[in-house]
Amino acid sequence: MEMKIDALAGTLESSDVMVRIGPAAQPGIQLEIDSIVKQQFGAAIEQVVRETLAQLGVKQANVVVDDKGALECVLRARVQAAALRAAQQSQLQWSQL
């Protein structure tokens, strides 16, 4: 899946996460994480983001995660929504999700 535009999903409210995804100039996933629980869960957040993007077939993107203590299911949903918006996909492939 190719990222065509910058897109975001989520809010900065407590127990939520804002995910921004856009096209990258370099190959790979460039990931920046800012989280109130980064010391405890930073590695888990990175793993969930990278797994979710891999499931969607994203190989090249700039990703910024601003986490306010979101649950894993919320993080996954926000990453999926932002990636689909950035790829400008209007038809969902439910089997990928």
From Swiss-Prot:
UniProt KW keywords: Cytoplasm, Phosphoprotein
O-(phosphoribosyl dephospho-coenzyme A)serine found at: S14
Subunit structure: Oligomer with a subunit composition of (alpha,beta,gamma)6.
Function text: Covalent carrier of the coenzyme of citrate lyase.
Major place of residence: cytoplasm
Location in or out of the cell: Cytoplasm
Organism: Klebsiella pneumoniae (strain 342)
Cellular component, GO, one term: cytoplasm
UniProt similarity note: Belongs to the CitD family.
Lineage: Bacteria, Pseudomonadati, Pseudomonadota, Gammaproteobacteria, Enterobacterales
Pfam families noted in UniProt: ACP
Protein name according to UniProt: Citrate lyase acyl carrier protein
